[in-house]
Amino acid sequence: MDPCECAKTGTCNCGGSCSCTKCSCKSCKKSCCDCCPSGCSKCASGCVCKGKTCDTSCCQ
């Protein structure tokens, strides 16, 4: 799976244990989803946040 699928579609689902919406992680476990958690101050593994807002452009 493309680790940055969330950046393109705004949603992703990782193995049923994790989901993202608009690049915000919901019920994610450690190193489950490569998307940005709320606040964009810290990112899941493999994701870099750009700027201070968390939207579909915050993942690369």
UniProtKB/Swiss-Prot annotation:
A divalent metal cation 2 binds at residues 6, 12, 14, 25. One of its GO terms (molecular function) is metal ion binding. The keyword Cytoplasm does not apply. It comes from the Eukaryota. Keywords: Metal-binding, Metal-thiolate cluster. Belongs to the metallothionein superfamily. Type 1 family. This is Metallothionein. The gene is mt.
